[in-house]
């Protein structure tokens, strides 16, 4: 609409208001006078009512004022009021036209969201996670989408976002709580309707969780174990590519974990560590044990697990030095579980992943790690989150709100500190469809980029983004770009006149459209401590106020003492679920050792004594043969003649042939290792 058309429309509205007001006064006056004949004939009849021309009031007023002065005074006041209404409409229209001239969008149309737009987006609903406040009203998001917050340390993200949300969310929650503050403030209220579980691998009173018991026996066992090994070999979440040692140790860990699950009485990661580094036997003997254990067969027909046997054979086929490197690499990933406190915390399951969404009551799981141990225990917390994310997004059985008993909120404060979780990054895109919401909090964009790389999809998959005043220029620039660009009208005045004149006789005013960010990066970094920015997809940005739970009685009433933890069995936990491995113990079967083409072959040292266990001999007896020493076989300093040297060579070849005769029919190489 052009400015000229707006002006014409404004004038038409003013005249219409005045005309309707005078017409209404005329009709009211005629009604009060009883539509008498001296008033003249009506203009027309509408539904039995005589309608007079609008200006008849003034004729009647001139001729009959003396007969009914009060009636004409009131009619005149009514007509005059219409004039005032017309003036008010003219003023309002002028103001509106002035604002419309200012709403230019040549370079951009960014602006702050209006209250009616926020209401339409349902951000004032009394449900969902907390985002902040606006005009003394809570800003909350109750959709299935994820939320991401950028807030520097000590900026109020805990007291304004995490604590209020946990003190109002009635579904299940997984809370990454580094310092334990959220446990102290929110577990008391949440324990009234949910199972409150504190998992702190450095605290003997912690609830227990054994990642190996989440492995499902059967077709899924290899996949589940490989997922566990993926996290074990990448404890920091910083590997983009694995080197040779990490790849081979991954294969060894998969085989060792499967063997422990099938054969060992204690089915824990601590047992995997002690199994691979048992001081009572050599590493080669451990590999032989893996290849000769009856994992799958019955008593009359033993059968080794093919994945276990393949992993053991892969390592056994390597040279002694390479085997040692593979073992040391694998043990470096299992060192955490040698800690007795960590081993105790992972020795059993007080809760299962399925309980998070299908238990009788919601689950409130607090993953608490002291800052002093955060680097050491990071692999275990990463493993738990990885298992939760993978297991709960495997199957979609209809609407999750109907098929699941509880919705799950993953409140991950300082989530980049956990390192890169590849599955978590990709799962954000479809996690909401399974009834899982993520509330992610990071200090800055740099922290996220350091963990997930520059081109990560974390921010892209978050529907709602919250930004506090930033200390990082890159984050401030990203927020400024996200807010968009507005178009402003700048007035330029030029004054002209005589130098000695008392006033300047000519003033020229010109208006120019210019582009300006809604907030510059500097303004983002200079936001007041009480302000925050809320960006919702499909809605103009919101400049809101931070929430402080300790200033709101609705929250302070819910801050209750946390549950008391005692030594021994954890008290507040759901009913136990049956796993697939408890009670499953298998032993070595000698028939498998007899069938294996290299059973019992152990090389103690290169160039040393080779001990070969013959299937026909008792287990305690070994056949010992002296392997030819390469230096003695080909000694350039030997003074013997060529004939004598040839005879010595033939003697040693005969010795090797006799040693080979022991293994005749088993397919062993004459010279092992080649």
Question: Where in this protein do the model-derived segments appear?
Answer:
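Short alpha-helix boundary/capping motifs
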Residues: 52-57, 358-359, 459, 507-508, ...
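P-loop NTPase motor domains
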Residues: 21-33, 100, 104, 138-139, ...
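Coil-to-alpha-helix initiation sites in intrinsically disordered, low-complexity, charged segments
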Residues: 42, 498-502, 648
């Amino acid at each position: 609409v052009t400015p000229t058309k707006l002006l014409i429309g404004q004038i038409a509205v003013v005249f219409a208001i005045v005309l309707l007001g005078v017409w209404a006064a005329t009709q009211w006056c005629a009604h009060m006078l009883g539509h008498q004949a001296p008033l003249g004939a009506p203009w027309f009849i509408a539904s039995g009512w005589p309608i007079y021309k609008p200006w008849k009031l003034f004729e009647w007023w001139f001729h009959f004022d003396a007969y009914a002065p009060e009636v004409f005074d009131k009619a005149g006041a009514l007509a005059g009021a219409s004039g005032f209404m017309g003036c008010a409409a003219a003023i309002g229209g002028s103001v509106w036209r002035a604002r419309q001239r200012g709403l230019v969008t040549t370079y951009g149309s960014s602006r702050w969201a209006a209250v009616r737009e926020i209401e339409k987006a349902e951000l004032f609903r009394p449900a969902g996670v907390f985002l902040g406040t606006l005009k003394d009203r809570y800003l909350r998001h109750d959709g299935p989408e994820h939320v991401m917050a950028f807030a520097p340390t000590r900026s109020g993200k805990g007291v304004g976002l995490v604590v209020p949300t946990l003190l109002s969310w009635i579904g299940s929650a997984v809370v990454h709580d580094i310092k334990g503050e959220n446990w102290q403030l929110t577990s008391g209220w949440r324990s009234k309707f949910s199972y409150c579980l504190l998992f702190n691998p450095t605290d003997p009173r912690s609830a227990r969780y054994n990642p190996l018991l989440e492995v499902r026996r059967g077709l899924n066992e290899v996949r589940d174990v490989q997922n566990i090994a993926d996290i074990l070999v990448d404890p920091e979440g910083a590997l983009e590519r694995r080197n040779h040692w990490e790849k081979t140790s991954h294969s060894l860990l998969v085989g060792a974990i499967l063997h422990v699950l099938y054969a060992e009485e204690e089915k824990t990661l601590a047992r995997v560590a002690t199994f691979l580094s048992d001081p009572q036997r050599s590493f080669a003997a451990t590999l032989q044990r893996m290849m000769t254990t009856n994992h799958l067969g019955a008593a009359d027909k033993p059968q080794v697990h093919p994945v276990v046997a393949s992993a053991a054979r892969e390592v056994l086929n390597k040279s002694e030095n390479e085997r040692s490197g593979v073992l040391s690499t694998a043990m470096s990933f299992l060192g955490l579980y040698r800690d007795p406190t960590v081993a105790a915390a992972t020795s059993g399951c007080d809760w299962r992943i399925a309980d998070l969404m299908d238990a009788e009551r919601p689950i409130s799981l607090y993953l608490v790690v002291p800052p002093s141990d955060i680097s050491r225990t990071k692999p275990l917390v990463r493993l738990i989150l990885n298992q939760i994310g993978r297991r709960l997004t495997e199957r979609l059985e209809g609407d999750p709100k109907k098929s699941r008993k509880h919705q799950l909120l993953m409140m991950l404060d300082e989530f980049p500190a956990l390192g890169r979780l590849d599955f978590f990054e990709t799962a954000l895109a479809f996690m909401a469809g399974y009834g899982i919401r993520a509330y992610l909090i990071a200090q800055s964009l740099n922290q996220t980029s350091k963990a997930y790389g520059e081109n990560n999809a974390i921010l892209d998959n978050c529907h709602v983004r919250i930004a506090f005043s930033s200390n990082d220029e890159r984050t401030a620039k990203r927020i400024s770009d996200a807010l968009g660009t507005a178009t402003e009208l700048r007035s330029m005045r030029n004054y002209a006149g005589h130098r000695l004149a008392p006033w300047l006789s000519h003033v020229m005013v010109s208006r120019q459209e210019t582009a300006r960010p809604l907030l510059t990066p500097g303004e983002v970094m200079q936001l007041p401590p009480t302000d925050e920015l809320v960006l919702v997809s499909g809605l103009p940005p919101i400049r809101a106020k931070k929430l402080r739970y300790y200033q709101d009685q609705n929250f302070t009433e819910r801050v209750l003492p946390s549950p008391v933890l005692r030594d021994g069995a954890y008290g507040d936990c759901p009913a136990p679920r049956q796993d697939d491995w408890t009670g499953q113990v298998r032993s070595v079967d000698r028939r498998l050792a007899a069938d294996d083409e290299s059973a019992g072959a152990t090389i103690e040292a290169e160039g040393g004594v080779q001990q070969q266990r013959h299937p026909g001999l008792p287990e305690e007896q070994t056949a010992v043969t002296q392997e030819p020493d390469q230096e003695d076989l080909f000694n350039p300093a030997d003074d013997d003649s060529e004939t004598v040297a040839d005879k010595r060579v033939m003697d040693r070849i005969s010795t090797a042939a006799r040693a080979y005769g022991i293994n005749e029919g088993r397919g062993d190489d004459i010279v092992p290792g080649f």
